[in-house]
Amino acid sequence: MNASPQAKGRRAALHDLPRRWPLACALLLSLPLPAFADSVTDWSAFADEVIGSAGGPPQQFRVLAMTQIAVHDALNSIDRRYRTYSVVGPVNPNASPDAAVARAAADVLRATMPSQAATINAHYAAAIAALPGCPVAAPGCIDQGIAAGAASAAAILQERQGDGSATPHLPYTLAPGPGIYQPTPPTPPPPAPYPQFAGWANLVPFAIISRRQFMAPRAPELRLKSRAYADEYNEVKAVGSFAVRNAAPDSEESRVARYFPAGGANLNAIARAVVAGKSLDRWQHARLFALVNMAVTDALITTFHAKYTYTFWRPYTAIHWSDDGNPRTRPDPAWTSYLTTPPYPDYPCGLPTTMGAGAQVMRSYFGTNHLPYTLAAGGITRSYTRLSDAESDSVDARVYAGIHFRFGCEAGVVQSRKVGKWVYHTQLRPLPHW
């Protein structure tokens, strides 16, 4: 489809991330639990049901990465097909894989979200009770599986002790000025931390070497007097305002703006939808889910480091500012964004970061971008045939929501794809006999 009028004449579209107009076709909301083929996908879906208690999206993905690593390592302590993330010893090969998966996931979720203990305990008890009895040749298989899961969960929980997650937020003291991020309404009342996740750049990564390794470079659009910045400013001002979007709530632009923050960027739900019908086994599912969540977590570390390095303002602040020094921009003190602006700086964008990292892992895993899936979120169902189309829509969504400039969203995808490739090629690699 054709690019938006605002985009014409600007830099070339991001490779394999086409702009489309209109569109073709905090993050993890509760989604219906469909019946899946195995315990790994079942526990992944259950984790989505309780993960909101972990905190904001960066905190959620950290917990999900730990959970999926524990599941992966538990299975590979029973049958070693892939390198484990943590050091776990081998267990009886007759141990129940499903018991191991259940205990590994439940232990990490309980430890990281104690407020959900009752719900997790009930789900775990039901999962164990539903297991078939052990064969005569493998007495004690369920207890052995439980022990394997407990060991892998303990290993990753110990490894992530003191990883920096206890101090996600830091004081923010920059004074208002042209281009400088400032909190946007509605701000939470004290003592809620605002803005948020300045400390997330200090989180110990799961796989990348450092938070700077794939950090988005300084973009030309950060120069307020440039034509490039003016183009970005005028695009989001035109298409992301509450007045424009609310006047056409059922338009493609308005629907995609709502879809992604309502759960359309739930990479675990996307991964489960992608693998449906592919006849993967528990080991393959576990490896993919662990890689996706590690990549997203590490990409967000990189993103928040960049956000608080550049501290670039959000469209709301920019459009309200009386004089940014650019003759091609015109302030509007009455302008409001279609959706509420998240409480942290603009560049680069977080939601497209998650999409880019997770999608790249799946592309690398399956060796193709053509991975069709359908996912419902926020009362909207969308279908994609290529992962890059979903990434592209996630970029558009933040512009149509009025909460991001396009260049920051594209940068988020670019840097996170690099993270996804790194994670895939360095972590949980197949063992030689596989």
Task: Provide a role label for each language-model segment.
Residues 1-18:
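N-terminal secretory signal peptides that target proteins for export/translocation
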Residues 11-12, 34, 38:
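Short linear motifs centered on Gly/Pro in flexible linkers and helix caps
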Residues 13-14, 22-23, 65:
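Sequence-pattern detector for short linear motifs
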Residues 20-32:
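Bacterial N-terminal signal peptides
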Residues 36-434:
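Acidic/polar surface patches and capping/hinge elements
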